[in-house]
Amino acid sequence: MDFKGVLVKIFTRNREVVLCAAGTAVALLGLGLVYKYNVRRPEKKFTRVGVVTQLLLHPMKSGKAVLVETAECLRMGLKYGELRDRHWLVITEDGHMVTGRQQPRLVLVSLSCEGGQLCLNGPQMEELRVPLQQSNNAVVDCRVFSIDVQGRDCGDDVSNWLTRYLESDKTVRLVHYEPHLKAQRPSEKEPLFPKDEKVAYPDAAPIMLMSEASVRDLNTRLNKDVSVFQFRPSIVVNDCEAFTEDTWDHIEIGQVELKRVVGCGRCLFTTVDPETGIITRPTHLNVVLSPFHGGTVRSCYRGCDSHFCTVRHLR
């Protein structure tokens, strides 16, 4: 099914887009917060559960977020102009991914596309512009959490810029996912994902959704507040109770239906401050996430958001 041109919109004239969800758990939100919507498929009962407040793209994995007012919701994630969510990846010369877990200052690097050029910006660095399309560059085999994937190398100028910025003693490179290249199949890591689901460089799903209420609740348990940006979601919602997003089976946003697949595990990356690129551990955030939200202390922790995949274009 072709999802091209499907828009998820926020900031309309009344600055509100209704989020609907299917499932009996939604009824527990309470009167005044939930109301029913007429839908074309009588077997699914949709009720209003919240509003979309932010759309975020992270074009470069571990890079700075880009806030947008509209985005195309495609099978492999959000798209805005030439930007695709998590379609650029920093790697070592032998193809292993480099993320904010090893290099927290990556969160300060912004990647944008203007006039057919790829633009990189970072603190105390000159802006770098190179051609976005470099079809003569090599296709590189690389790995995201031991899953094989490919990317088009973005060239030596980009490599030198990133290596200098990170003050790395080892050369790093940037690759760009193109549609004909080998993609990840999330079902190889999590069997709940559809077998035909494909993503570029996300940890798992093409869409990650969380609520502002969940972050507010979490902050009551910390000695220093964290922001939604530390969790790097694609879609942020409000007007719902904390952690109710974990109960939503199917949701409709505008003309798109999304299906929840699994909760999002969390690691030390959540302790990287997106404003400074410094690891801060307020009451050790990842340990706090574990006991109160059903997890166990291990390398990844039960998070406060959920992985979704695009199901269909409704109209």
Language-model features: locations:
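Metal-cofactor-dependent catalytic cores
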Residues: 2-315
